[in-house]
A protein has these predicted regions:
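Outer-membrane beta-barrel and related beta-rich outer-membrane complex signature
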Residues: 137, 162-198, 236
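Outer-membrane beta-barrel domain signature
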Residues: 7, 67-71, 97-101, 136-138, ...
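Transmembrane beta-barrel wall of Gram-negative outer-membrane proteins
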Residues: 99-132, 136-175, 207, 213-223
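Residue-level detector of the transmembrane beta-barrel scaffold of outer-membrane proteins
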Residues: 29-31, 61, 92-94, 122-126, ...
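Extracytoplasmic loops and strand-loop junctions of Gram-negative outer membrane beta-barrel proteins
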Residues: 62-64, 92-96, 130-134, 194-204, ...
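Extracytoplasmic beta-strand/coil segments of soluble accessory domains associated
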Residues: 4-36, 65
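N-terminal periplasmic accessory domains that precede
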Residues: 16-19, 47-51, 60-62, 74-97, ...
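Short acidic/polar hinge/loop motifs at secondary-structure boundaries
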Residues: 7-8, 35-66, 83-85, 190
Length: 236
């Protein structure tokens, strides 16, 4: 099973706690332009840092465990490399508006890319917003903005420099686990013990606020037809 397919299964069947090859997520690595972005404390990649940037993160390569590739030695859980070089995005613009009845109810995204211009420059930008005054679970809310900006200069057939920065400031109310007895008394399996009324207004006691602004710079050097040097430095 390829990483792309298993990622889809992991998202769609997350309540079943799907795991690639049975390994925990810290055994799967996620790279961006060749730089490992797994958290140094948990060992896991935080998908919240690229939340709402679907168009900006579409260019990716996925590998299985120990599979031959050009960006890592290959961990036992597989790896993914997201390519955020501006010249790799198709020229044009895209606007999308969607609704759902899960964590958020409304999502808007806009992406624009120049493609590779005649002067060797390429620019790509993306903005996104996800919102819910209250999700399908009572007492939850969702307020998230996301941005992405990339620029690249292709000097010739051998050298190019690129820069990308992105972030997704998010604030959301969490749902909490409960017991079958509580669900029975509430007459609903959507019962959420994390919320209540304070001064006549709904208040969630578990609010998550996250923001990991990130940036990465890359230099690509095609030494010859059989050898390439890719150097990247990033931070978050």
């Amino acid at each position: 099973m390829c990483i792309r397919d298993s990622s889809n299964v992991g998202y769609l069947f997350s309540p079943m706690r799907f795991r690639v090859r049975g390994y925990n997520s810290q055994y799967s690595d996620t790279y961006i332009n060749g730089v490992l972005f797994n958290d140094v404390e948990t060992g896991r990649f935080s998908y919240g840092m690229i939340g709402g940037l679907n168009d900006a993160t579409r260019n990716k390569e996925g590998i299985g465990a120990f599979e031959v590739n050009n960006f890592t030695f290959g961990p036992i859980g597989g790896a993914t490399n997201i390519n955020m070089r501006a010249s790799q995005y198709a020229a044009g613009s895209k606007l999308s508006l969607s609704g759902c009845n899960r964590n958020y109810i409304l999502r808007g995204m806009y992406t624009y890319s120049t493609g590779l211009l005649k002067n060797g420059w390429a620019f790509t930008g993306s903005l996104g917003y996800r919102w819910a005054n209250e999700g399908v679970i009572e007492g939850t809310f969702y307020n998230a903005f996301s941005y992405f900006l990339a620029a690249e200069k292709v000097f010739n057939d051998k050298h190019s420099l690129s820069f990308a920065t992105w972030g997704a400031p998010t604030e959301r109310g969490q749902q909490g686990a409960s017991t079958e007895e509580a669900y029975y008394l509430a007459n609903s399996h959507y019962y959420n013990p994390n919320w209540g009324y304070q001064n006549g207004e709904k208040r969630n006691s578990r609010v998550v606020r996250s923001f990991e602004p990130s940036a990465i710079a890359s230099w690509d050097f095609d030494i010859n037809k059989e050898m390439k040097l890719k150097t990247s430095a990033g931070f978050k």
